[in-house]
A protein has these predicted regions:
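Soluble "head" domains of membrane/secretory-pathway proteins
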Residues: 2-20, 25, 36, 40-46, ...
Length: 185
């Protein structure tokens, strides 16, 4: 009587070796793709602190588009992540208030861009103090936190005008906690 099937000695070992090799190649490809996506396309970020309240809450998690500002310049009203100029290991999240060529001035807590009073329905309260009228230089932006009285931003010398090369990306979506999920401007 002949067996229904027959396996050459060692065929199982060869197939197992091929299977392991296929798994390793698949894992390496997945890791490389994940690194490319995270470094060049999108990345998760954690909101650390109250400077963007009420728009963003402390400990919320965001998806940040890392590609967009390689294709175009930031626009007023966008929320972005940038590298803190005084400490490259820290990232800040703020709103773009003025772009290159704009003038900005803060009088009696009111923000004026190009001599126009800004309607800012996203802030907690007007900021204390004034800021002299200045023109935003080319290749830089002026940023502020939505929680004006609890934000280290372009009004302070340690941040100042943010150079384009320090911008890491545009905040697109709050994804955690799930109850707070929303798209950002």
């Amino acid at each position: 009587m002949q067996p229904l099937f027959f396996v050459k000695r060692g065929a199982f070992v060869n197939n197992l070796g091929e299977e392991i090799k296929d798994w390793i190649v698949s894992i390496v490809i997945a890791v490389v793709l994940a690194m490319i996506i995270r470094n060049f396309l999108v990345a998760p970020y954690l909101v650390d602190g109250p400077s963007m309240m009420p728009t963003l809450q402390n400990q919320q998690r965001l998806v940040v588009n890392r590609l967009i500002y390689r294709l175009r310049e930031p626009e007023k009203g966008e929320i972005l992540i940038f590298q803190y100029p005084k400490d490259p290991s820290r990232d800040f999240i703020k709103r773009v208030i003025a772009v290159p060529g704009d003038t900005i001035e803060i009088k009696d807590g009111n923000v004026f861009v190009n001599d126009e009073l800004q309607t800012e329905d996203y802030i907690l309260s007007k900021c204390r103090g004034d800021y002299p009228r200045v023109k935003i230089p080319e290749g830089h932006i002026f940023v502020m936190g939505d929680n004006r009285n609890n934000s280290e931003d372009s009004r302070f010398p340690d941040v100042g005008f943010v150079p384009f090369e320090l911008i890491k990306g545009k905040a697109m979506v709050v994804f955690w906690p799930l109850a707070d999920m929303k798209a950002l401007p």
